[in-house]
Amino acid sequence: MGNILRCFKGDDDGGDHYPYYKPTSRPHYQPPHYHGQPAAPPAPLQQQHLGPHGVTPSTVGVAALAHDLLNFESTSMVPDGLSQHVVSSRKAQVKWYQKLLEAYKNTTPPPKTPANAAQLIARALNMIQRADLEGILEFYNLPIPSLPTASSNYQPSLLPEGVQFVLNTLPVYDKCIGDGDGFTAYVPTTDPRESANVPLEVHELVIARTQARKCRDYQSADALLSSLDEAGYKIISCSDDEVLARKYRIRMRGIDAPELKMPYGKESRTALVKLIGGKSVKIYVYDLDQFGRYVGDIYCNNLFIQEQMLKNGHAWHFKTYDKRPEFARWEREARAANRGLWASGNPEKPWDWRRDQRNARQDAIQVY
């Protein structure tokens, strides 16, 4: 715990600086000052009064964090007052402090300014929901770091030709897999591409829900969850934490699986569930289709999912929209081996089935 002990002693090197910060869901954040009096400029470091442990008023939050981490290492107890600022359970808070303690020990030199401490907390707890993160920072009276811009790490030259962007999802729920070629995925808003694009309305809904839960107004909290869903976002429980995530409807590029009501439709969906259910996936997005779905190539545990679906006879090659020769080859291999849907000899094409269904509905309307 050398870093934590050094925090109480202070450091005279003067090498620290404040990076630029701007609040997101708290747009009116200002440093505290006495009502009716203008905030006085900070005195030079050597002129500031030193409090207990040699801590200046401007660094009291840094010292409090160090004290709480030292206490947590000895007792495994989180600060009593933290629950008034966050909504997640005590068990989740313990996990946060385990991560914070590890990050603090690995930081050299230890954080000596509020800005440094805020950055450490934001990095160590980058997977918790934004409202909880802001609650912890508020608890220690630390500034709220600005979110990274969407283009800060974006390198389109490294992406395959035609790929617009990449999604790294949370584990895919089995119930979110609709059939053998489509599913709904959620991407955490801590992802750099997502973080800068979360609407202010969504931030406000999350904060309002947090306040409602603190007041035990669970009916209002549930209503706010519904509003989040309508905005295309969801709060997802992840390892005792809650993560704010954006919803994406995904269509797998280049394949067409039997519809659920077709022969082999349920088997095709089951095959996809076995491949990605409960797992995180990487999606290389090419475009948006007419139904608002993101069309892309899917990878999971180093497997190319379209390849697995085609090779095992769980889907057709959708030649109309994808001319990749390897897709045609994988389908031929499955046909030759009578795998999956090809075991029936002459399976109906899904696009033909959908056309017949549309025509049947139109005929029924005309007869009526």
From Swiss-Prot:
Residues 16-56 are annotated as: Disordered. A lipid is attached at G2 (N-myristoyl glycine). One of its GO terms (molecular function) is endonuclease activity. It is a lipid-anchor. Its EC number is 3.1.31.-. Ca(2+) binds at D181, D256. A lipid is attached at C7 (S-palmitoyl cysteine). This is Probable staphylococcal-like nuclease CAN2.
